Amino acid sequence: MENLKKQVGIKAAEFVKSGMVVGLGTGSTAAYFVEELGRRVAEEQLEITGVTTSSVTSEQAKALGIPLASIDEVDYVDLTVDGADEIDSHLNGIKGGGAALLMEKIVATYSKDYIWIVDESKLSENLGSFKVPVEVITYGSEQLFKEFERAAYAPTWRLNEEGEKLITDMQHFIIDLHIAKIENPQKLADELDLMVGVVEHGLFNGMVKKVIVAGSDGVKIISQ
């Protein structure tokens, strides 16, 4: 599995050229993309500016010598490469397993090009086998949790290693929704967008046109 992740990370790095502002995703697969960019910066004199999507990715990029800027310091991002937790047949996706969904969606929104890199196990006909993360402000979060219970979304709190409610980089909580089959991802996204106290959710609908997939038959690119 790790070899597959590395393959797509290296493949995605081929789309990066000198002079680009590059969005650096978060997660185990995106880490291989960042690692390959670091190698190219050191060995090939690749000149880029990275915009990171989490504190974890920032630390990795700094250690690799990749110059960084915040999303507010650039006009736009040329290309963002990130992983995904589940992707349906229409290239809608669920992200946020690494608790970085808010920053990931902000960087993706201001990117000219956006690519996901995954192994074939992340592909599904319909979304729902992976939980839907919902980032919420701490105040009133228990009320939101009850709302999700009433909607039969089987909510659970995202916890840290100490068993306490996880605090995101943006100082929010995450409530994970466990919905067996999401028939209409956009309808669910619209519903969540209208809920007071919800900061962002992990449904990334219609945001990517290209997915790089590694599987038993090699690396392929799926385009929409």
Curated annotation (Swiss-Prot):
UniProt pathway annotation: Carbohydrate degradation; pentose phosphate pathway; D-ribose 5-phosphate from D-ribulose 5-phosphate (non-oxidative stage): step 1/1
Record's keyword terms, sorted: Isomerase
A Pfam family matched in the record: Rib_5-P_isom_A
One Gene Ontology term of the molecular function aspect: ribose-5-phosphate isomerase activity
Ligand binding (substrate): 26-29, 82-85, 95-98, 122
Catalytic activity field: aldehydo-D-ribose 5-phosphate = D-ribulose 5-phosphate
EC number: 5.3.1.6
Active-site residues from the entry: 104 (proton acceptor)
Biological process annotations from GO: pentose-phosphate shunt, non-oxidative branch
CDD domains per the UniProt record, alphabetical: RPI_A
InterPro entries (alphabetical): NagB/RpiA_transferase-like, Ribose-5P_isomerase, Ribose5P_isomerase_typA_subgr, Ribose5P_isomerase_type_A
Family of this protein: Belongs to the ribose 5-phosphate isomerase family.
Stated role: Catalyzes the reversible conversion of ribose-5-phosphate to ribulose 5-phosphate.
Complex formation: Homodimer.
Name the record gives this protein: Ribose-5-phosphate isomerase A
Species this chain originates from: Lactococcus lactis subsp. cremoris (strain MG1363)
